[in-house]
């Protein structure tokens, strides 16, 4: 609540916290491979605004590990059909009741529209990262469902609540930004200005750290600041952050020997349809 400036919906926070252990058990049952110590106990890392390590993880690709295992479970369900390369373009509405959606199917040689009729439609709007210069999202996420919500008078809320992740690898290339996990800072990485000076507590809430980085970028007249992993031993880097290490190496940076340029980027869209 404190990290959310006490503007969080208390009911949602309570549900998230009280159901977390049950959900973790479900994820493990689906095959999510959270890291464990030599005794088989779950390992925890630390992230921003946390007073103690309490984050489960899988190497440095926890999100991919969870979503891939969830997708595998969905693909096994006999009552679920997954349509790929299919873009929603409108709602089928009559007398203020939703009866399904209209989609554009683009996987065939000739793209065409189809109508999917449904007694119930789950309106999950997704992200908006494609609207930003710097975002960890895929560029096709442009908030189309939000625009349709406005067209059909569906109530939105908190659409100005956009989470900026403090550290993504700076690049002048187009496309999504590569996330430098917050747990890197949780393990001891520090942020430095152009003079090599530390300028912020790296484990403050994300909005505070991102703001401090933007302010430092303006002071330095630079499009990025530096992230140094000098306080993390090489073994931890290679075991905990193998994918970050490899990606940075491909971009010309050896994070075991040098700092890397990082920039804040849009990460999560916190608002959406009122529920």
Predicted segments, located by residue:
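Extended, hydrophobic alpha-helical segments in both membrane/secreted and soluble proteins
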Residues: 121, 141-148, 275
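Hydrophobic or amphipathic alpha-helical targeting/insertion segments
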Residues: 20-23, 32, 145, 151-152
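A glycine-rich dinucleotide-binding beta-alpha-beta segment and adjacent secondary-structure elements
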Residues: 83-84, 89-104, 244-275
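Glycine-rich active-site loop/strand segments that organize a redox cofactor
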Residues: 1-16
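An anion/pyrophosphate-binding glycine-rich loop and adjacent beta-alpha core
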Residues: 148, 154-267
């Amino acid at each position: 609540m404190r990290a959310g400036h006490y503007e969080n919906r208390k009911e949602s926070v309570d549900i998230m916290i009280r159901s977390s252990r049950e959900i973790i058990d479900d994820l493990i049952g689906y095959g999510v491979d959270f890291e464990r110590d030599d005794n088989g106990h779950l390992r925890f890392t630390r992230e921003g605004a946390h007073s103690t390590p309490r984050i489960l993880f899988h190497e440095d690709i926890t999100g991919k590990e969870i979503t891939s295992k969830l997708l595998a479970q969905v693909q096994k369900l006999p009552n679920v059909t997954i349509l790929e390369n299919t873009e929603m373009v409108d709602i089928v509405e009559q007398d203020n009741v939703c009866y399904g959606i209209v989609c554009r199917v683009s996987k065939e040689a000739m793209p065409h529209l189809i109508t999917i009729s449904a007694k119930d439609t789950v309106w999950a709007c997704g992200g908006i990262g494609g609207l930003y210069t710097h975002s960890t999202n895929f560029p096709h996420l442009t908030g189309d469902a939000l625009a349709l919500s406005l067209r059909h008078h569906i109530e939105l809320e908190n659409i100005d609540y956009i989470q900026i992740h403090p550290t993504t690898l700076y690049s002048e290339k187009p496309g999504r930004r590569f996330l430098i996990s917050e747990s890197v800072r949780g393990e001891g990485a520090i942020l430095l200005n152009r003079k090599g000076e530390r300028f912020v507590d790296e484990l403050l809430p994300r909005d505070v750290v991102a703001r401090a980085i933007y302010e430092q970028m303006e002071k330095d007249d630079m499009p990025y600041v530096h992230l140094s992993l000098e306080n993390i031993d090489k073994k931890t880097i290679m075991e905990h952050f193998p994918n970050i290490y490899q990606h940075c190496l491909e971009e010309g940076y050896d994070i075991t020997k040098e700092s890397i340029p990082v920039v804040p980027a849009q990460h999560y869209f916190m608002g959406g349809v009122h529920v």
